[in-house]
Regions:
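Conserved FAD-binding catalytic core of PHBH/FMO-like flavoproteins
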Residues: 63, 160-259, 263-266
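Conserved N-terminal helical subregion
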Residues: 75-174, 182-187
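FAD/FMN-dependent oxidoreductases across multiple families
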Residues: 233-235, 239-326
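C-terminal helical "tail/cap" subdomain of flavin- and related membrane-associated enzymes
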Residues: 314-392
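N-terminal Rossmann-fold NAD(P) dinucleotide-binding loop
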Residues: 15
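Glycine-rich FAD pyrophosphate-binding loop
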Residues: 23-48
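N-terminal FAD cofactor-binding segment of flavoenzymes
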Residues: 46-87
Length: 392
């Protein structure tokens, strides 16, 4: 049986960030295993259709602490300006990086680039062992350690098990850590697109009666589209050919960026919120989407998860001789409670307010957007959380 200080299940962005963060903070003194089921081929870049994620300013500040941002900045697209509007109504608000002032409000990175970069970083951390492709098939918790059996027959023992294996976490299911589910009755249609006008680092969020439509700036003048629709509308939209889809998208978004010229591969997924009230258990910590999965309306999902990672890494440093000790896990749970609760509430409220076409909601949200555009003090609380500059 191979012995480690920490075993992390899930080697995507959350799990790998935690491994690199703990390695950096501990000076490589803790042995870490990362178990990942899917073998990534970083040489087979998806090109135009590469999936992207937005990193808040707070997330960038955290990544800097682990010496991970400098390399990532080379392929990141800065968000200089955010425009928020309500389709068919006058309410709108703008946020510009010069108002803060900061270099950028956030950055957009492509997941393939991050994966390749993290793979390069991994080679510099000899204490991190990537077990891939492999998946957890059995977990046994003892008083002082956790024993994990993999599907290839390998046995691992560690002082701490970290579940970073997504919303449908196999670890959490095996250990019966329950999740609260809420169906937003919306489907996200995602694609990369190109417009006639250059995005110039601008991000857009447009609220419609069926749900929000967001465009994030990417490299090579592409934009990442997330279009939230009612299920029947999403089915119809997905059935359109590219020309028809362009027309529908143009009608929903408008002409602020000119004509939509190129539409990449489209995919869709149902939007559900999952939340595990209990983000720790005996010798178990839960991070990222395994702890909570949010609606993409405010781009808070990964940015909330990175704050899980930073807090857990700091908590581990308080008791490096036993990363799974009760004092570590109770500190992590206590410090994350308020931020998780507030971000979850904010995201859910935004969905219900801005995905609703009742007259009272339309009037309220348009007055709210207009007020925020004219009163910085009203914009500040939402801006602070959007930028990820919140206490952990």
């Amino acid at each position: 049986m191979k012995q480690f200080d920490i075993v992390i299940t899930g080697g995507a962005m959350a799990g790998m960030t935690l491994a690199l963060a703990v390695s950096k903070l501990s000076g490589g003194s803790l042995s870490i295993a990362v178990v990942e089921p899917y073998q990534a081929d970083y040489d087979a870049h998806p090109g135009f259709d590469s999936r992207a994620i937005a990193l808040s300013l707070g997330t960038v500040n955290i990544l800097k602490q682990y010496d991970l941002w400098q390399g990532m900045a080379e392929f990141a697209t800065p968000i200089k300006h955010i425009h928020v509007s309500d389709r068919g109504h006058t309410g709108m608000t703008d946020i510009d990086h010069q108002e803060i002032p900061v270099d950028a409000l956030g950055y957009v990175v492509e997941l393939t680039d991050v994966g390749r970069y993290y793979s390069e970083q991994l080679s510099q951390h000899k204490n991190i062992h990537l077990l891939c492709p492999a998946r957890v098939s059995q977990i046994e918790r003892l008083q002082h350690q956790v024993c994990v059996t993999l599907n290839d027959g390998q046995s691992l023992a560690s002082k701490l098990l970290v579940a970073a294996d997504g919303a449908r976490s196999t670890c959490c299911e095996q250990l019966e850590v329950e999740s609260e589910l809420h169906d937003f009755e919306q489907v996200a249609v995602i694609a990369n697109v190109k417009t006639a006008q250059a995005h110039q680092g601008r991000a857009f969020e447009r609220f419609t009666s069926s749900g929000p439509l967001a465009l994030l700036p990417m490299s090579e003048q592409r934009m990442s589209l997330v279009w939230c629709l009612k299920p029947d509308q999403a089915t119809q939209i997905m059935s359109l050919d590219d020309s028809e889809f362009k027309q529908a998208l143009q009608a929903a978004f408008g002409w602020r960026l000119g004509e939509f010229q190129t539409i990449g591969h489209r995919s869709s997924y149902p939007l559900q919120q999952s939340f595990r009230q209990q983000n720790t258990s005996h010798r178990l910590a839960i991070i990222g989407n395994a702890a909570q999965t949010l609606h993409p309306i405010a781009g808070q999902g990964f940015n909330l998860g990175i704050r899980d990672i930073a807090t857990l890494a700091e908590s581990i440093m308080s008791h490096v001789q036993d990363p799974g000790d009760y004092s570590v896990l109770s500190q992590y749970q206590r410090r994350r409670e308020l931020d998780r609760s507030m971000t979850l509430s904010l995201t859910s409220s935004l969905v219900h307010i801005f995905s609703n076409d009742y007259l009272s909601f339309r009037v309220a949200r348009n007055l709210g957007l207009a007020a925020m555009d004219n009163a910085t003090m009203l914009k500040a609380p939402l801006l602070t959380r959007t930028l990820g500059l919140v206490a952990r």
